[in-house]
């Protein structure tokens, strides 16, 4: 009986413990009171699991909050920053026009004050900055040019040349360089006075040069030269204008009866085509091997407005390809009038004679310079302005050009000057003045040789091309000189084509004199 009672009591105790545990886990009883009833291992497991779950939940919530904050900041920056930026820049932009508008007015006021001060000075002092140009060919300042120009405009009617040399020492240096055949001792280098010419008066003298006579002679000589041009075959091409796309369509068809340039009795011809005066855009046909009658049949398009066609010229240059040396120029065709055949609304076929290549026709570029002579001061100023379309002398397709000017007398070089070097360009701009002291009695006996050189740091400087001006020059060189002598104290500016130097040397500095760059006479 006692055994059964103990079993019943134990079962009741277990049921009671079970009920108490359910109440504790259900939250009906405080956990501190329940911890003393449960076994140590079970109570420890229940408390540790709860702590781990709470800490894990806190980490997840904090991470999500941080991610949400980053996303919100990024969206805010994308949407709101451009608006704020424009608002910040707007006030600064409103201030800029005021500063810009105020700056030119201050500059103009200072320039006007300087001009007024210069105009109030005597005439010799006003011309002094322009006359004192360095003989080492510096750049002419823009302020000196403007001051001199305005002074000459105001005083041109009543002001005569007032620059008088103090002594004849300047002419003595020139006298030492003259050849012995000239009787220099009998030459009077004194400077005479000239009467002031009033408005409407004209000065006539027996020795005055008349440029009309020289111009007429040069025109006649050029006309005779054109009649004597030697031909070397014919070129066939077609022209048409595309009104819709504003394109000049040029079709090079073929060439006939070309001269043989190779020792085998044939040539390897190809054609280069330009639409002058712009030489930056050019086209070239394929090379046809070993033939004197090549059939090209190639089409090229030049973008040009129809109204500008009357001022354009087509230039065809026919070359012989040489793999191992410089390509030989066979000849050229220049079409001065594009409307010679038709109005180009339809395709028009043209046959033209190919003019044989001469030294003058080789394209080496052009140079622009001005000449001005002051007879009372015995001073000649040559201003090198710029060059264009120079021949590329470096492997990079460019050049480092500078201009060298030599004062010549009967084949001897008396003096030489040069400009600065312009790096890596085929169209350099100089605006540099070069001055020579030449007495009026010796102007007819001298000439100027202008050479455009390519500077080479390692080897010799090479000659790109030369031109010459003087009474013994030909064509434009002589006309430019005569015009300078006819209009004293006035800069005369012209473009001059560069010619290849006969007996071309690698270095122009090694030559004792500048040989004449005249093209060879055609039969």
UniProtKB/Swiss-Prot annotation:
Highest taxon listed in the record's lineage: Eukaryota
Residues reported to bind Ca(2+) 2: 262, 320, 322, 328
Topological relation to the membrane, as annotated: Single-pass membrane protein
Effect of mutating residue 268 to A: Loss of function
Intracellular or extracellular location(s): Cytoplasmic vesicle, Secretory vesicle membrane
Transmembrane segments: 56-76
Keywords: Calcium, Cytoplasmic vesicle, Disulfide bond, Exocytosis, Membrane, Metal-binding, Phosphoprotein, Repeat, Transmembrane, Transmembrane helix
Chain ranges on the Vesicular side, renumbered to this chain: 1-55
Residues carrying Phosphothreonine: 136
Residues at which Ca(2+) 3 binds: 322, 325, 328
Residues annotated for Ca(2+) 4 binding in this entry: 394, 400, 454, 456
KO phenotype (gene knockout): Impaired food-finding behaviors due to defects in sensory perception of smell. Decreased number of olfactory bulb synapses in the external plexiform layer, but not the glomerular layer, of the olfactory bulb. The size and dendritic arborization of olfactory bulb neurons are decreased, but not the synapse density per dendritic length. Defects are due to impaired exocytosis of IGF1 in neurons of the olfactory bulb.
Keyword Membrane assigned: yes
Keyword Nucleus: no
Organ and tissue specificity: Highly expressed in the olfactory bulb.
Assigned protein family: Belongs to the synaptotagmin family.
Domain notes per entry: The cysteine motif mediates homo- or heterodimer formation via formation of disulfide bonds.
Function: Ca(2+) sensor specifically required for the Ca(2+)-dependent exocytosis of secretory vesicles containing IGF1 in neurons of the olfactory bulb. Exocytosis of IGF1 is required for sensory perception of smell. Not involved in Ca(2+)-dependent synaptic vesicle exocytosis. Acts through Ca(2+) and phospholipid binding to the C2 domain: Ca(2+) induces binding of the C2-domains to phospholipid membranes and to assembled SNARE-complexes; both actions contribute to triggering exocytosis.
Protein name: Synaptotagmin-10
Organism: Mus musculus (Mouse)
